[in-house]
Amino acid sequence: MHPLEIIDRYYEAGSLRDLLVKHSQCVAQRALRIAFAHTELAIDTDFVREAALLHDIGIICCDAPSIHCYGTEPYIRHGVMGAQILRREGLPRHARVCERHTGAGITVAEVLRQNLPLAVPQPTTADEPYMPVTVEEKLICYADKFYSKSHPEREKTIEQAVRSLSKFGGDGAARFLDWASLFEGYGGGLS
């Protein structure tokens, strides 16, 4: 499977495709650097490379003109829209990364508390559909927080990523810090 071929099925050459690919390559490089440093975690590096390159494919469906996205969906739904695309492509495992990488994952409680335009599973379901579960999902979600789409060439520090996540509440920032400890031995906390 060649992620760029899949991207090319949905994106024409130009600013949006270039931005998506640059951002996704940065995310993939950081995730792979961490994966290769942590052989004890038995991370599927082939999958990480593919899924990191495809994790934001859904931005084309969203309304975010500042990053050349002229779709109709709210930007918060880019993961859900990307998951739909990748399921149609026969890539359900990659689709889960799309759904679960927004923020530092989003709990159902956060969806309800913030009135986010995301589907909520039935109350009897224990599943958290927008939360990373596997180490690969967590790693890609983590690596993604270091690169914005508006300036993909600028790598954020852990502290800058935490500040960015803290704007949406402390839960996501705390999850991110747990991953920073796991993946990079970071010992700082929320300030």
Language-model segments: which ranges?
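Generic N-terminal amphipathic, Lys/Arg-enriched alpha-helix
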Residues: 1-17
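Long, contiguous secondary-structure blocks with strong helical propensity
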Residues: 4-5, 27-39
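Amphipathic alpha-helical segments within well-ordered protein domains
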Residues: 8, 28, 32, 82-87, ...
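Divalent metal-dependent catalytic cores for phosphoryl transfer on phosphate-bearing substrates
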Residues: 12, 40-154, 158
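A short, charge-rich alpha-helical start-of-domain segment used by transcription regulators
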Residues: 18-23
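Generic structural signal for well-ordered, non-transmembrane alpha-helical segments
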Residues: 25, 92, 181-184
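Short, mixed-charge aromatic SLiMs
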Residues: 51, 55, 105-106, 162-175
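Charged phosphate-binding loop/patch that engages nucleotide di/tri-phosphates or the phosphate backbone
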Residues: 165-191
